[in-house]
Regions:
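Zinc-dependent deaminase
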Residues: 1, 73-143
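Short, flexible loop/turn motifs enriched in small residues
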Residues: 3-7
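Residue-level recognition of the N-termini of beta-strands and the immediately preceding loop/turn
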Residues: 8, 54-57, 115
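Short beta-strand scaffold segments in enzyme catalytic cores
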Residues: 8-17
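Short beta->alpha transition motifs characteristic of CBS
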Residues: 20-27
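A short, polar/charged loop-to-alpha-helix boundary motif
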Residues: 28-43
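Immediate flanking context of iron-sulfur cluster ligation sites
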Residues: 50-62
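Local cysteine-cluster metal-coordination motifs and their immediate loop/turn environment
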Residues: 61-79
Length: 143
């Protein structure tokens, strides 16, 4: 958040529980495609075998957008666990007076059929909600 990026973060974890990579949103760079889930998918494609990717889990603060879900599916990553849903994010943005995302939200399984997805996680979703409130208050005139 300190860099001006929306408060999203993800961790890529191997089947044995080893943290392989982590990243944060970088859309503040001016490139709206610099989503952390997309970056982790690219990292996984370059650094993991197909078997390792399939056995890995991505833990993320927010449900993948369609672009990131597609990247996840194309590289063959395994399970996704997300703290807050796209539906929750849309409600928070409305509550904060923010603009809706430019791309329609789709459930991850609509983009990547058959993938194992868990979320939202209620206890963590509240923490993500608080981060979005703090971000919006800091970087907008409306909070």
């Amino acid at each position: 958040m300190e860099a001006g990026d929306e408060p999203f973060g993800s961790v890529l974890v191997a089947a044995d529980g080893t943290v392989l990579a982590e990243d944060r949103n970088r859309v503040g760079s001016g490139d709206p495609t610099r989503h952390l889930e997309f970056e982790l998918a690219r990292w996984a494609a370059a650094n993991m075998t197909s078997e390792e990717r399939a056995a890995a889990t991505v833990y993320t603060s927010g449900e993948h957008c369609p672009m990131c879900a597609a990247a996840h599916g194309w590289v063959g990553l395994g399970r996704i666990v997300y703290a807050s849903s796209s539906e929750q994010l849309a409600a928070w943005l409305t509550e904060l007076g923010g603009a809706a995302p430019p791309v329609r939200a789709l459930r991850i399984q609509e983009v990547v059929p058959g993938i194992l997805v868990e979320g939202p996680v209620p206890a963590l979703a509240e923490q993500v909600h608080d981060l979005h409130h703090r971000f919006y208050r800091k970087y907008s005139n409306k909070g």
